[in-house]
């Protein structure tokens, strides 16, 4: 750790020397505060001349309360029985780690068990802060309207009519009569917020009568929803949990005019749940990108791990993903169509008749699914795309 701090000190003054005389007043201590608060490397600090700005120390440290709160929540969830001595030692270690690995938060620290790792392994993990740097580097500003091409589920579906062939419509401007016509030959429909994330706000509605249609219309009226025909999944995926569509999350990067598949995970829902989302009770397990075989345990947001599905008793480890080569090819071809985005996380499903289709995609797919199941850092894999 001391060696790492010395390296940061050395890098700081090397950058300062390159930016003289404007950076004459830049101090290492002030930079340390910025590094902790804003998770920035030395180059960013100097390139943006943050040493010249009149920064209120109270404003600079405003995030401290949030960080402490995050630590308390993670500690209670992951180490509720930890001794006072353990809590003190590792709380200090956590703050040093935030300095050494910009962007680290308490969830990262506990999820990847930093308290059991040495620096050589800690530095291999992608932190939450690194994710946002990668996202901005490859996809542009987070608030860019262009991201609506992917983040808006209706716009995304319209981009790939040859891949997304199920029936769908959006609630915006939808009349009662148009809704009835859309639902005419459907027994049920899945309803999602147009810009929703993490499986929040999603529900399934059975359609058996005009009363069901009227009830659904009242629910979606004036709201921003996408309504979709329920996907019937391949039996090899559905056997793990029939109540949810169990998806394959594939990560791709557009680099040097080609698409690179950088990772993949299988997401599994729980009995009675409509979605397989990690943040709403689902589980995730790593997939070998070359073989299409699950190579890790499945874990959930609460740090529980499974090698066999707890509800259906299906064996997870070693399971083969159907149509794997076709999944990779479909993702690569789709990414080439929207290559203005450098980093995309695709939610893929194989239908009961073997068609590969998308449920949705995200421009800032988190790394917890890539790193948590296998507890292996993926930073080295992505560093080459940051140059």
Question: PLM ranges: what are they?
Answer:
Residues 1-59:
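Intrinsically disordered, low-structural-confidence terminal and linker regions
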Residues 3-6, 305-343, 350-387:
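C-terminal active-site "lid" helix and adjoining low-complexity regulatory extension at the edge
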Residues 136-248, 255-257:
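Active-site nucleotide/adenylate-binding loops and adjacent lid/helix of ATP-dependent enzymes
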Residues 186-188, 245-249, 261, 343-345, ...:
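Extracellular structured ligand-interaction cores
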Residues 241, 245-329:
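ATP-dependent carboxylate/phosphate-activation module, predominantly the ATP-grasp catalytic core
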């Amino acid at each position: 750790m001391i060696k790492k701090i010395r390296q940061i000190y050395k890098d700081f003054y090397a950058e300062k020397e390159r930016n003289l005389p404007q950076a004459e007043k830049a101090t290492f201590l002030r930079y340390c505060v910025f590094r902790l608060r804003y998770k920035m490397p030395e180059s960013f600090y100097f390139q943006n001349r943050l040493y010249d700005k009149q920064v209120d120390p109270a404003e600079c440290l405003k995030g401290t309360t949030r960080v402490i709160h995050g630590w308390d929540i993670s500690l209670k969830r992951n180490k509720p029985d930890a001794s006072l001595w353990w809590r003190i030692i590792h709380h200090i270690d956590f703050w040093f780690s935030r300095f050494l690995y910009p962007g680290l938060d308490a969830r990262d620290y506990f999820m990847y068990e930093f308290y059991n790792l040495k620096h050589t392994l800690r530095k291999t993990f992608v932190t939450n802060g690194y994710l946002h740097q990668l996202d901005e580097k490859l996809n542009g500003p987070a608030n860019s309207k262009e991201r609506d091409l992917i983040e808006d589920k209706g716009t995304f579906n319209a981009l790939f009519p040859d891949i997304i062939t199920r029936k769908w419509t959006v609630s915006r401007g939808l009349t009662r009569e148009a809704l009835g016509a859309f639902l005419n030959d459907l027994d049920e429909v899945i309803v999602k917020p147009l810009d929703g994330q993490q499986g929040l706000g999603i529900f399934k509605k059975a359609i058996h009568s005009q009363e069901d249609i009227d009830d659904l219309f009242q629910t979606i009226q004036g709201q921003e929803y996408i309504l979709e025909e329920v996907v019937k999944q391949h039996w090899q995926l559905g056997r793990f949990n029939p109540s949810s569509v169990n998806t394959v999350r594939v990560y791709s990067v557009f680099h040097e005019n080609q698409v690179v598949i950088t990772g993949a995970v299988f997401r599994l829902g729980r009995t009675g749940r409509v979605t397989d989302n990690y943040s709403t009770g689902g589980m995730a397990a790593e997939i070998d990108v070359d073989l299409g075989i699950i190579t890790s345990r499945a874990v959930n947001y609460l740090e529980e791990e499974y090698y066999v599905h707890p509800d259906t008793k299906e064996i997870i480890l070693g399971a083969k993903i159907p149509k794997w080569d076709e999944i990779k090819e479909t993702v690569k071809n789709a990414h080439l169509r929207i290559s203005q985005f450098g980093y995309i996380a695709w939610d893929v499903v194989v239908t009961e008749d073997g068609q590969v289709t998308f449920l949705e995609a995200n421009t800032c797919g988190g790394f917890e699914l890539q790193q948590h199941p296998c507890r292996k850092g993926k930073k080295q894999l992505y560093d080459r795309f940051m140059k």
